[in-house]
């Protein structure tokens, strides 16, 4: 039997601890911006299920609804699973070195003396003691109100089993085999459970809508769907029953049929004296702890022991007939999930369908033999930890797509090959320490990944057989154009290693390829350009005569005097200067500029038109 502590003393100590760490509790879900020893690092409040149960019973004295405290759990206590339940039946009597008769006499003598003293003292201190008890009770209630107020605002808590923690006196055996509600933490976003059966926590339907981080360590999970699907549906729809992993025999007349895996083997019970039962139309028979147990067999029929109500049986059977479909809000905010050392052997498909926002997943310390195919249901997954399992290969990545995966931890497994990792182009960091990889050539599978930065690979057989494995791996990545030197076991290439490194492959030069013009798509443009070309005017300069003019000739061959176009100053420079007629024409234009001024163009035009008419008359004659 462990040590105990007075309940009121525990309440005072807890209130003092919370009051001195209020700010650090408020920052519990977040990381501290710096790691200075002077900064207030975030702290999570740690409780045991035993102490939480005691506090909830005290909160009920305030008239606060803390949730049901009578949800029984079948087969909770096992040899491999710890709990706060304390039994005095198997304790062997201690050997005493003195006679029992003498001890009894001494106890009787001391008892008589103490009774006489207490009777005399009670005469003088009856009234003052009653007043002090009243004041003490009021102080305890005020402290409880403060603790309850803090519980409703706490963003993170940790339920950790610790056998060395003193139990509350007169509550040593509680919570027995009942589930403890956690709905009093209304602002909870981070929950950590260590060493407890997850069925001992009630309120998973509420937790699935608020949690952003869930840590389950050493919780002995039979299946991951038990916490992500089963308990959420059980707490939301059955409410008064608790699932059990035990397989129950079918009734002789029942016919076997299939059921949904999320609702298999349900067995829960509720006390007949509970508030939930008293609300129904049937009065309780006895106010005892769990006098009726509802058993759901595999065929979906409900059989009762001790007079279970038909209403509960009907609701239970209706749940068995429904599909395991969670609401859209269930686990929609969960970003980090850790289920480490929970004895998981496999991950069923469709178990992660509701975790569309999950960024980090930790399944280390389990008994997985392959990378689960269900990981393909996590589109936002960036970090995956599968350390300390029994995984032999990575070929699952050929069948699933994890486009955002950046960190992969596969240390302490049985890997013999890295086949499949070439299908994870976003991978940046890889940890494969303490595996069974014998050939360094396996790292060529990662060469084409330009995002890859760091690898941890110590304690593999090839690190002993290949003395220069680091240089070999560095050169593998240098062969690929555009790649960079990676880090191996936290270190880049050393000074001596750089002497044996090959030159980096240069990136190929960019070749700008001109795509041929699509004639079909650009046919209208070609047509329009041809029409413009037909309508354009051709400039003709007659340089045979000294008094020549520039006129235009349309495409049809007709000469029109209205379409005469004169050359400007820049165009006049294009006239060949080595001919005598060209020089004469230039001098003529310069003389017109000096005499006519800005109107020299009009004068030249009139002169050229007149000369052209006279020439036509002479030709006609």
From Swiss-Prot:
LRR repeats lie at residues 333-354, 357-379, 380-401, 404-425, 426-447, 451-472. Gene3D superfamilies: Ribonuclease Inhibitor. Disulfide bonds: none annotated. Keywords: Cytoplasm, Leucine-rich repeat, Membrane, Nucleus, Phosphoprotein, Repeat, Vacuole. Residues 552-581 are annotated as: Disordered. GO terms for cellular component: cytoplasm; cytosol; nucleus; vacuolar membrane. It is found in: Cytoplasm; Nucleus; Vacuole membrane. Transmembrane segments: none annotated. Its main location: cytoplasm. InterPro entries: Leu-rich_rpt (IPR001611), Leu-rich_rpt_4 (IPR025875), Leu-rich_rpt_typical-subtyp (IPR003591), LRR_dom_sf (IPR032675). The modification Phosphoserine is found at residues 269, 271, 274, 290, 292. This is Uncharacterized leucine-rich repeat-containing protein C926.06c. It comes from Schizosaccharomyces pombe (strain 972 / ATCC 24843) (Fission yeast).
């Amino acid at each position: 039997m462990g040590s105990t502590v007075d309940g009121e003393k525990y309440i005072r100590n807890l209130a003092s601890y919370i009051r001195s760490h209020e700010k650090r509790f408020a920052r519990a879900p977040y990381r501290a911006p710096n790691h200075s020893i002077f900064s207030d690092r975030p702290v999570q409040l740690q409780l045991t299920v035993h102490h939480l149960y005691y506090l909830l019973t005290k909160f009920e004295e305030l008239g606060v609804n803390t949730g049901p405290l009578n949800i029984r759990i079948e087969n909770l206590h096992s040899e491999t699973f710890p709990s706060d339940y304390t039994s005095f039946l198997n304790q062997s009597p201690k050997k005493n070195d003195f006679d029992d008769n003498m001890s009894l006499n001494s106890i009787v003598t001391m008892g008589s003396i103490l009774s006489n003293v207490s009777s005399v003292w009670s005469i003088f201190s009856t009234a003052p003691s009653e007043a002090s008890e009243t004041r003490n009770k009021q102080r305890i209630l005020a402290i409880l109100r403060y603790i309850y107020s803090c519980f409703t605002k706490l963003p993170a808590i940790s339920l950790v089993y610790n056998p060395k923690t003193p139990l509350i006196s007169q509550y040593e055996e509680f919570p027995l085999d009942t589930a403890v509600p956690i709905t009093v933490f209304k602002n909870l976003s981070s929950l950590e459970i260590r060493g407890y059966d997850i069925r001992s926590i009630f309120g998973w339907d509420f937790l699935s809508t608020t949690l952003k981080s869930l840590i389950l360590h050493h919780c002995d999970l039979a299946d991951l769907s038990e916490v992500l699907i089963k308990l959420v549906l059980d707490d939301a729809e059955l409410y008064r029953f608790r699932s059990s992993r035990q397989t129950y025999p079918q009734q002789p007349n029942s016919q076997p049929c299939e059921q949904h895996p999320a609702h298999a083997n349900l067995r829960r019970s509720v006390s007949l004296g509970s508030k939930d039962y008293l609300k129904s139309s049937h009065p309780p028979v006895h106010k005892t702890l769990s006098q009726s147990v509802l058993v759901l067999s595999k065929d979906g029929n409900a059989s009762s022991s001790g007079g279970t109500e038909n209403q509960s049986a009907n609701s239970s059977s209706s749940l068995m007939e429904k599909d395991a479909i969670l609401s859209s809000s269930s686990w929609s905010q969960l970003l980090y999930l850790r289920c480490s050392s929970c004895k998981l052997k496999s991950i069923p498909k469709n178990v992660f369908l509701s975790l569309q926002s999950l960024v980090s997943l930790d399944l280390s310390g389990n008994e997985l033999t392959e990378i689960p195919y269900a990981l393909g249901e996590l589109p936002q997954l960036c970090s995956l930890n599968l350390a300390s399992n029994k995984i032999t290969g990575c070929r699952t990545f050929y069948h699933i797509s994890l486009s955002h995966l950046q960190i992969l931890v596969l240390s302490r497994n049985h890997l013999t090959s890295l086949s499949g990792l070439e299908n994870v182009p976003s991978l940046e960091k890889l940890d494969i320490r303490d595996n069974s990889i014998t050939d360094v050539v396996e790292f060529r599978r990662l060469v084409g990944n330009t995002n890859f930065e760091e690898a941890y690979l110590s304690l593999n057989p090839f690190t002993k057989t290949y003395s220069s494995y680091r240089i070999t791996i560095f050169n593998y990545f240098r062969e690929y154009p555009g790649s960079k030197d990676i880090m191996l076991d936290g270190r880049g290439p050393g000074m001596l290693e750089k002497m044996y490194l090959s030159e980096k492959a240069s990136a190929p030069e960019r070749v700008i390829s001109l795509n041929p013009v699509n004639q079909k798509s650009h046919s209208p443009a070609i047509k329009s350009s041809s029409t413009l070309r037909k309508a354009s005017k051709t400039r003709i300069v007659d340089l045979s005569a000294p008094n020549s003019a520039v006129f235009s000739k349309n495409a049809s061959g007709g000469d029109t005097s209205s379409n005469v176009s004169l050359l400007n100053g820049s165009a006049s420079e294009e006239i060949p200067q080595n001919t005598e007629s060209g020089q004469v024409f230039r001098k003529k234009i310069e003389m017109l500029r000096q005499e006519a001024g800005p109107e020299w163009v009009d004068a030249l035009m009139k002169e050229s038109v007149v000369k052209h008419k006279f020439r036509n008359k002479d030709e006609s004659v």
